[in-house]
Amino acid sequence: LRVEGREIISVDPDAYVIDALFFMKRNNIRRIVVSRSNNILGIFSVDEALYHIINNDVESKLKDAKLKFPVIVKSNELKEIMRSMIDNDTDAVIYDNKIITYKDVISQIDWSKSNALIGELSKEAIFVEPYTKIKTVGELMLKNKIRHMPVYGIVSSRDIVYNYDIDLNLSINKIMIVEVYSVSKEESLHTVVSTMIKRNIGSVIVTNSKNIEIVTLKDLVTFALSNLIY
């Protein structure tokens, strides 16, 4: 089984970070490949975007910006793609001038092969109060290398990135998503993933009697590879 991926969206390294932020928001994308003359310098994703926003450094050129190292693979076979993602701790790889992301991988997996419950994958979430400053939330995301945080609602790094021109001292409730996809820990993995794909969302809140827990796209890819679901 092979993963096709999508055409690369690239930008010149002499473009500015703020230009990349505007482009990402306008096109509703999470990452841009920084390249010149087919030479890929790196990937500028919501993670790097968040770093520059929180550090008030959006006027730098992309060639001087924080970038992800581009992981270029020789095969688009599903198992190999998942292994490359996990081994390199990356949410996207490049194959044959196309980019393959977690979402591309997850949509190719036959989740009906698994009888697992979503609670088997969930882990305790880091959450904040609605009055927490946007900057504080961004700093927590960077420190803990996470993209989603429950806030009696939920906020993702993308929400902050797409509001790059907002006052970072405002409360996070100004940009958080109120309607959250949440399920019981007894819900089947297959059902949950199907809904995530349909709604195009990157995480699900899992409820239990003690803690707020979360499952992300990375958790799904890791589980699929470890349990030979593909």
Residue ranges of predicted features:
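Tandem CBS (Bateman) regulatory domains
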Residues: 1-7, 43-71, 76-88, 95-127, ...
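Conserved functional loop/turn residues at catalytic and ligand-binding sites
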Residues: 28, 145, 179, 200
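Short acidic/polar active-site loop segments enriched in Thr and Asp
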Residues: 30, 90-91, 147, 202
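Hydrophobic, helix-prone linear segments
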Residues: 1-41, 119, 228-230
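Hydrophobic "anchor" residues
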Residues: 40, 211-212
